Amino acid sequence: MERLASHLSEWLERQITGGGGRGAVVGLSGGIDSTVVAALCKRAFPRHTLGLVLPCESDPRDARDAQLAASHFAVASCTIDLTAAFRALGREVHESCSEVPADDRTTTANMKTRLRMTTLYAFANHLGYRVVGTGNASELAVGYFTKYGDGGVDLLPLGNVTKTTVRELARHLGVPARIVDKPPSAGLWRGQTDEDELGFSYEELDAYLAGERGPHAAAIAELVAASAHKREPAPLAPAPPA
């Protein structure tokens, strides 16, 4: 695991400095992925890593775990509660357009992640940093991220690392057990977990990605196909014929 940790932290340093960046900013959710990414960023940029804790109608325990992650790895951090901004935007959207119902949970949840993205980039722009994403290979494969939300980042160090390997890497890096052992959650609403929403475990998903076909293989294949657009850049219309 040390070889992987060194490879990823060195890659971060090369990618960011090679593109003119001064450091890294990462959103700290209190989960395993963001904690691992913060630890890798701290290795790459010991003096120029910033973690942002961005609660938005969130479980207070997640913010506490995010702050634990920051203190454990000595990552400078700020906490910005986006709840008021989110509610104001939600009211404006729903009151201005009746076609967007206020009880559309998916749309509402995606608005949260896009507010977080906007906040991360505000800090990155000001500091000359790059936004480092926390998505892993398992999530990317089935599109378990918000387009231009948590998917709106500059770099994805875990983009080729499955959730199973992220857990191993977390233990190697010394991520607190409380964070390693908690059920994975995007924090979109109270009690939400990744595996409940997906309908299968990360272990089965990672086995599928390794070529095994379990009882949820068809459902996984369907998600992979349906989310292809999320993994591709916006298509460009061809120039008109001369």
Q: What kind of feature is each model-predicted range?
A:
Residues 31:
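Conserved G/P- and acidic residue-centered "switch" motifs that form tight phosphate/ATP-binding loops
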Residues 34:
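Catalytic nucleophile loop
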Residues 1-24, 39-43, 47-50, 57-58, ...:
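ATP/NTP-dependent adenylation/nucleotidyl-transfer catalytic domains that generate, transfer
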Residues 62:
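Conserved Walker A/P-loop ATP-binding site and its immediately adjacent core
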